[in-house]
Design a protein with these regions (language model features):
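Glycine/aspartate-rich loop-and-adjacent alpha/beta segment that forms the canonical ThDP
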Residues: 502-528
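Beta-strand->loop->alpha-helix junctions that form or flank phosphate-binding loops
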Residues: 70-75, 95-99, 149-156, 194-196, ...
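Active-site beta-alpha connecting loops in nucleotide-dependent enzymes
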Residues: 41-60, 70-82, 379, 398-472, ...
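Residue-level signal for inorganic ion chemistry
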Residues: 62, 112, 168, 198, ...
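Short glycine-rich anion-binding loops that position phosphate/pyrophosphate groups of nucleotides
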Residues: 116-120, 173, 222-223, 242-243, ...
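Nucleotide phosphate-binding/pyrophosphate-handling subdomain across enzymes
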Residues: 29-45, 58-65, 332-441, 456-459
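N-terminal leader/targeting and accessory segments in enzymes
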Residues: 2-152, 344, 538-542, 546
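Phosphate-binding loop of NTP-binding sites
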Residues: 102-109, 116, 120-275, 279-290, ...
Length: 565
């Protein structure tokens, strides 16, 4: 295997005439999946930038269709051993290490494909690569006939996908909404459903197997949106609040990025928007597609809402392009009682409303939607109830990395609550979090780099008990002891230990999923010591087939924690 800067795997070298013929830039606007299946990319030189999750998928795809693939990553081979081994046996050249000039990897390429965090405008790519990509973009814009096109993994997928797609974006709630939407669509056995994107599964892996009658649900992050030139059939927005300001600089810039999916939506499709979020609601009318609004109160005509504790629809018609119709709704447009949802918290009710709208747009019968929604238990690392041990409920919300998400998690459970928080600061305003923590939590146990900042914030808001712990396992034990003591002498049936960090994970963990697994392992150890049996994978996992396997972490590229909400 490669071991050092610039080392490559053996390849059959093309002739000079072959190079001239195959290095002509690929016309992406004319490329179709049918043409790819018939050999349109065979022998064409393609450069893949980045060897993380999306880069691996791109390398597999282009190799499978006969392209001559070169992979560039600034990290040395020793750090990429697992990824390189995953591509063993394929005719792929590796150009690895900080000494490799990225420009040399695409000088004779017909196409350059990238992971989401490798793009000219974002600081997540290293400066030399960012400058080289910016120059490539300028050459393309100037009409340079030798400049290869630049395409992201997700944009390539959306360009070639033959099936209707549902794109889900927003600041928080994306993963739950996407997974529940997929579970609802899967209730119709006549269509296969694929779930991927930022949720952890690069969908380009599925391209060659897709058929027009399939359904695809894509979670789309703010890293992926700027790379898109094609939209989805249906675009779903959960909410848009301040986040990732370390990448975008201002709230306004972040909001401009988030508009992208609405601007690109298929005009024959639909926009599904949260009427209770003013930024999201203002997107109505973009892209020329009709809008379906949802809210946790009386539904807007043509939308989804709640009446008398029932989720109801007010005239949501199925999309003509997906074929078929929908069964008649019950009295008052009833679909299912709110109480049948297994997802805790008002924010999860909003997520469910959006997913119900998706089901209706694709012609699902209300009883099928009801069964799927009522059977959906949630997504790993998002308000995941791991276990209840001696009257203490342990909740893994490792993906709660910003104040709004933590506040929603605190409101989802009854007191007493002990909050575990801390990690690497994301550069967002944490001040609004202080009052809700002081109001809802009896104590906080803090870890990581942001612990001092959070301690000052929580104490100044009036929270009397704030402790620091050197690591997460210690924090879980301290929080457990505090929670058990807080429950004594009260009528509360359970106390809750809630991991909802209000911070990224990179100071102590690989990513938020690694942090969540560490939390669950600590809970399992406490349970074992007390003779309580609990699975290390936790108790709250999706029941539906199209969800991810446990441990699939939506991270990619050059250090961007894409999946953290």
């Amino acid at each position: 295997m490669p071991s050092g800067e610039g080392r490559t795997t053996p390849m059959t070298m093309p002739t000079t005439d072959d190079r001239r013929r195959t290095a002509e830039p690929i016309d992406l606007d004319r490329l179709t999946l049918a043409a790819v299946r018939e050999g349109a990319l065979e022998g064409r030189p393609v450069t893949v930038l980045g060897l993380a999750r999306s880069g691996l998928a791109l390398a597999r795809f282009f190799s499978a269709v006969g392209a001559r693939v070169t992979v560039y990553d600034r990290r040395p081979a020793e750090e990429l051993r697992q990824a390189i081994e995953a591509l063993a046996g394929r005719a792929i050249a590796f150009r690895l290490g900080p000494g490799v000039d990225p420009v040399t990897t695409w000088r004779r390429a017909a196409l350059v494909a990238t992971s989401p965090s490798i793009q000219p405008a974002f600081p997540t790519a290293e400066p030399r690569l960012r400058a080289a990509l910016a120059d490539l973009v300028r050459r393309r814009a100037a009409g340079d006939p030798t400049a290869p096109p630049l395409v992201s993994e997700l944009d390539l997928f959306l360009r070639l996908c033959p099936a209707p797609t549902v794109g889900v974006t927003g600041t928080k709630g994306k993963t739950t909404t996407a997974a529940l939407s997929a579970a609802i669509l899967a209730a119709d056995p006549s269509h296969r459903v694929f779930l991927g994107g930022n949720i952890g599964r690069p969908l380009v892996d599925e391209l060659l197997e897709l058929r027009p009658e399939d359904r695809v649900v894509v979670e789309i992050s703010e890293l992926q949106l700027p790379t898109l030139s094609r939209g989805t059939t249906v675009a779903v927005y959960t909410n848009v609040t301040a986040d990732h300001l370390d990448r975008h600089g201002t709230v306004e810039a972040y909001r401009r990025v988030k508009r992208r999916l609405a601007e690109l939506v298929d005009p024959r499709g639909a926009l599904v928007l949260n009427a209770e979020d003013p930024v999201t609601a203002a997107l109505a009318g973009l892209g020329g597609a009709p809008t379906v609004m949802y809210r946790r109160s009386l539904p807007i005509p043509g939308g989804v809402g709640v009446v008398d504790d029932w989720i109801v629809a007010a005239g949501v018609a199925p999309l003509p392009l997906v074929g078929g119709g929908t069964a008649g709704l019950g009295p008052g447009g009833r679909i299912l009682p709110v109480g049948e949802l297994r997802l805790p918290g008002a924010h999860n009710l909003s997520n469910a409303l959006a997913a119900v709208a998706v089901g209706l747009l694709f012609g699902l019968a209300p009883d099928a939607i009801r069964r799927a929604a009522a059977g959906f238990a949630g997504v790993e690392h998002r308000l995941e109830v791991v276990a209840v041990v001696d009257g203490v409920r342990f909740v893994n919300d490792s993906q709660g990395t910003q104040p709004d998400a933590v506040a929603a998690a605190l409101r989802a459970f009854e007191p007493p609550i002990v909050l575990i928080a801390g990690g690497r600061d994301k550069g967002v305003d944490l001040a609004p979090l202080g009052p809700i923590v002081a109001d809802r939590a009896v104590a906080a146990v803090l870890i990581g780099e942001s612990a001092p900042q959070l301690e000052t914030l929580f104490r100044s808001a009036g929270l009397e008990r704030v402790e620091r712990a050197p690591d997460l396992a210690t924090a879980v034990r301290r929080a457990d002891a505090i929670a058990r003591a807080a429950r004594e002498g009260t009528t509360a049936p359970e106390a809750t230990v809630l991991l909802s960090p209000a911070a990224a994970s990179f100071d102590m963990f690989v990513d938020y999923a690694d942090r969540g697994r560490a939390f669950k392992a600590a809970v399992v150890e406490i349970a074992r010591e007390r003779g309580v049996r609990v699975s290390a994978a936790g108790a709250s996992k999706p029941d539906a087939a199209p969800t991810l396997p446990a441990g699939a972490a939506p991270t990619d590229g050059a250090g961007g924690e894409v999946g953290e909400r």
